């Protein structure tokens, strides 16, 4: 058993050594952000740098300048987190991370791919609409239009956002007032709530607040029309929050149904128990 463990350990160390390219630099890490790379001012974000090999420490850089260095926090020594609180406009920009490998000693890696962080809320909100309304079937094309505020001059970039995605779905550069985003050959995975923002293409990357949400539901065109209509909600409609009264009413009806069913079951079970007890009392004693 011990010899097997030693063999596995030797294999791991050998693999770690062979992960280093011939030029002496370890493979580049990956950099991600949670909950998103597009966040409102005064919010929080965590950037995570992950290396493919055990590391001694990690460095986070913004626009090429080092901001912070931390040691890995997990047992595999392959991950480090960088926390930002109370985000401001000047926190926006391009970030990369690097790590120093343990084998060979203190060998710096190549930088990760750049991660663009956008802090919103410094320009007027855009308008957001669909070019058409009605049923959206799988395989069709959906075009969404984002329009910046008329008071904002100069070229900007537009970003299409989707609830639940940590990065923009699409980005577009534009010298005009509007930008169109096309979703080609949509599937059920494209269903969801979308919004858009626009921002300056250069530092300090001033960005608007997000537009109102627009909901897209994609219907499978292989389903019968009556089944599809009963299974999916209306398509391409702006979302409207449920009122507390409507939600409370639904919960009350459901609770009454549950209580009624439970009471009926208890009455039936109680009847069986009473009948069994009564029969036991009337039956003669059996000899031993």
UniProtKB/Swiss-Prot annotation:
Protein's membrane topology: Single-pass type I membrane protein
Extracellular compartment spans: 17-258
PTM: N-glycosylated.
Domain Ig-like C2-type: residue ranges: 27-113, 124-217
PANTHER family referenced in this protein's UniProt entry, alphabetically: MHC CLASS I NK CELL RECEPTOR (PTHR11738), T-CELL-INTERACTING, ACTIVATING RECEPTOR ON MYELOID CELLS PROTEIN 1 (PTHR11738:SF157)
Keywords carried by this UniProt record: Adaptive immunity, Cell membrane, Disulfide bond, Glycoprotein, Immunity, Immunoglobulin domain, Innate immunity, Membrane, Receptor, Repeat, Signal, Transmembrane, Transmembrane helix
Subcellular location: Cell membrane
Subunit structure: Interacts with Fc receptor gamma chain FCER1G.
Species assigned in the record: Mus musculus (Mouse)
Tissue expression as described in the entry: Expressed in lung, uterus, lymph nodes, spleen, thymus and bone marrow. Expressed in bone marrow CD11b(+)Gr-1(+) granulocyte precursors and mature neutrophils.
Signal peptide as annotated in the record: 1-16
Record SUPFAM superfamilies: Immunoglobulin (SSF48726)
Family annotation (SMART domains): IG (SM00409)
GO biological process: adaptive immune response; innate immune response; negative regulation of CD4-positive, alpha-beta T cell proliferation; positive regulation of cytokine production involved in inflammatory response
Protein name: T-cell-interacting, activating receptor on myeloid cells protein 1
Induction (record text): Up-regulated in CD11b(+)Ly6G(+) and CD11b(+)Ly6C(+) neutrophils upon S.typhimurium bacterial infection. Up-regulated in CD11b(+)Ly6C(intermediate)Ly6G(high)MHCI(-) neutrophils and CD11b(+)Ly6C(high)Ly6G(low)MHCII(+) inflammatory monocytes in response to TLR4 ligand lipopolysaccharide (LPS) stimulation.
Functional summary from the UniProt entry: May act as receptor. Negatively regulates TCR-mediated CD4(+) T cell proliferation and activation, possibly by binding an unknown ligand on the T cell surface. Enhances Toll-like receptor-mediated production of pro-inflammatory cytokines by macrophages and neutrophils.
Glycosylation sites: 74, 185
